[in-house]
Amino acid sequence: MSAIAPGMILIAYLCGSISSAILVCRLCGLPDPRTSGSGNPGATNVLRIGGKGAAVAVLIFDVLKGMLPVWGAYELGVSPFWLGLIAIAACLGHIWPVFFGFKGGKGVATAFGAIAPIGWDLTGVMAGTWLLTVLLSGYSSLGAIVSALIAPFYVWWFKPQFTFPVSMLSCLILLRHHDNIQRLWRRQETKIWTKFKRKREKDPE
């Protein structure tokens, strides 16, 4: 089945290149996420500039475009090595989308979707780690960073044959968050709900 893997890698990259954040913002008449808010075309920035509905739509689409190519390849019996490359291709498409001038997001939701076919137990633990970190800290970026750091250990515990490709995905996510890591270190990172607190202060009930 590895003979079909190169084609699946291309399909995964093209799926990843469909930037849902940009498309949803266009459809909803919202500002371009590449030039508004944090400048990152992802669900968190769409939440800041467009609200929950648009952000949820972006999040679901970004997860699916990572999940479906990997899931399809998994069902076809593609080996863990090639599955890892397919997952990375989907994330590379999200980060450097061919359809949008190679300027994309950070790949967190797409990476999560790509890991999901490995097992629902792993998916639940990963989602719980991200959510707990965000709830305790208020930083979406910190949730992504902590999840990326811990993901290889989770995978080693649940499905050790996927440890290497997931480790490569984690490195990619961490590299894309180098600016966030610097801002967190300097205590300059914006918390995910800061916008909503400011809005309530401006528009008291």
Swiss-Prot record:
Q: Is Cytoplasm there in the keyword field?
A: no
Q: Which reaction is this enzyme known to catalyze?
A: sn-glycerol 3-phosphate + an acyl-CoA = a 1-acyl-sn-glycero-3-phosphate + CoA; a fatty acyl-[ACP] + sn-glycerol 3-phosphate = a 1-acyl-sn-glycero-3-phosphate + holo-[ACP]
Q: Which residues cross the membrane?
A: 4-24, 53-73, 81-101, 112-132, 138-158
Q: Name one GO cellular component term.
A: plasma membrane
The subcellular localization recorded is: Cell inner membrane
Q: In which pathway does it act?
A: Lipid metabolism; phospholipid metabolism
What EC number(s) does the entry state? Answer: 2.3.1.15, 2.3.1.n5
Q: Which keywords fit this entry according to its UniProt record?
A: Cell inner membrane, Cell membrane, Lipid biosynthesis, Lipid metabolism, Membrane, Phospholipid biosynthesis, Phospholipid metabolism, Transferase, Transmembrane, Transmembrane helix
Q: Which Pfam families match?
A: G3P_acyltransf
- Major place of residence: membrane
- Which residues are on the Periplasmic side of the membrane? 1-3, 74-80, 133-137
Does this UniProt record's set of keywords contain Coiled coil?
no
**Cytoplasmic compartment: which residues?**
25-52, 102-111, 159-205
Q: Identify its membrane topology class.
A: Multi-pass membrane protein
**Which terms in the Gene Ontology molecular function aspect does this entry carry?**
acyl-phosphate glycerol-3-phosphate acyltransferase activity; glycerol-3-phosphate O-acyltransferase activity
Report quaternary structure and partners.
Answer: Probably interacts with PlsX.
Regarding protein family, the annotation reads: Belongs to the PlsY family.
Question: NCBIfam families, from UniProt?
Answer: glycerol-3-phosphate 1-O-acyltransferase PlsY (TIGR00023)
- Explain the purpose of this protein: Catalyzes the transfer of an acyl group from acyl-ACP to glycerol-3-phosphate (G3P) to form lysophosphatidic acid (LPA). This enzyme can also utilize acyl-CoA as fatty acyl donor, but not acyl-PO(4).
Provide the protein name: Probable glycerol-3-phosphate acyltransferase
Provide the species name.
Escherichia coli (strain K12)
What gene does this protein come from? plsY
